[in-house]
């Protein structure tokens, strides 16, 4: 979506393909991109590279996952999205922050994005022609120094939010638990009140349940 937005802004025509191999009537493209999240997609990525040897491939599912969109387009933080390639999608999505305070061995976020920093306000993410429903893709919402400002924006703007990537429950404290309980949080479809968390390491059971109990005590079921 970011690449599509940037290319359209340059006057380019963009096609979204869902298969790695061209069809019989596929046109010739000036540039081809591919993205892989998981390692088990490597055979599919290889098919893409066989079909388009000059394809630019990124994502955490390939060996060299350090390639970023910003490097490809020669810009800094680029937080613009082309929703036209998913016309059925009616919400707004984006990041208010990048990076993470944790350094889990299995995760590339701290290696790729560094320490937490703010990149957008809630108002930056919202599409004014849509309902006030925001899917937040933040990996560590409370890791950014400006999280209190983001909370005020949610409340003052009467937004509903879905913290799609979950909350770092291991880093929850009484203040953040109380704040979460006061927010209109929902599942990714905005049909059910739901807060996502992750339990990535069984050895951290005590830390996990300490955070979970703080959420429960704050009124989050």
Predicted regions span which residues?
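Short catalytic/ligand-binding loop motif for oxyanion handling, primarily in non-cytosolic enzymes
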Residues: 24, 41-43, 63-67, 102-103, ...
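Canonical Radical SAM [4Fe-4S] cluster-binding loop centered on the CxxxCxxC motif
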Residues: 1, 6, 87-129
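A structural signal for short, well-ordered beta-strand segments and their strand-loop junctions
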Residues: 15-18, 54-59, 93-95, 135-138, ...
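A short, structured N-terminal alpha-helical element that caps or precedes a catalytic domain
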Residues: 1-57, 62-64
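Ser/Thr/Gly-rich flexible loops in soluble cytosolic domains mediating phosphotransfer, phosphorylation
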Residues: 55-82
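Core AdoMet radical
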Residues: 33-37, 108-211, 215, 221
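Short, aromatic/basic amphipathic alpha-helical patches
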Residues: 3-4, 44-51, 67-72, 149-154, ...
């Amino acid at each position: 979506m970011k690449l599509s937005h940037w290319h359209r802004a340059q006057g380019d025509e963009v096609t979204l393909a869902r298969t790695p191999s061209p069809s019989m009537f596929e046109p010739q493209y000036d540039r081809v991109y591919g993205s892989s999240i998981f390692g088990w997609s490597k055979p599919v990525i290889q098919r893409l590279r066989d079909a388009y040897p000059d394809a630019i491939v990124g994502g955490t599912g390939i060996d060299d996952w350090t390639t970023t969109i910003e490097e490809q387009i020669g810009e800094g933080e680029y937080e613009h999205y082309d929703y036209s390639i998913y016309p059925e999608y009616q919400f707004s999505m984006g990041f208010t922050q990048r990076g993470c305070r944790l350094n889990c061995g299995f995760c590339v976020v701290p290696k790729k994005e560094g320490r937490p920093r703010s990149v957008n306000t809630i108002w930056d993410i919202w599409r004014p022609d849509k309902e006030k429903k925001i899917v937040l893709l933040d990996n560590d919402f409370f890791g950014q120094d400006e999280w209190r400002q983001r909370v005020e924006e949610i409340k003052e703007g009467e937004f509903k939010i879905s913290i799609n990537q979950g909350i770092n429950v291991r880093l929850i404290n009484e203040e953040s638990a109380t704040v979460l309980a006061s927010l209109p949080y929902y599942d990714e479809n905005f049909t059910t009140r739901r807060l996502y968390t992750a339990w990535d390491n069984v050895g951290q059971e005590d830390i996990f349940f300490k955070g979970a109990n703080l959420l429960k005590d704050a009124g989050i079921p």
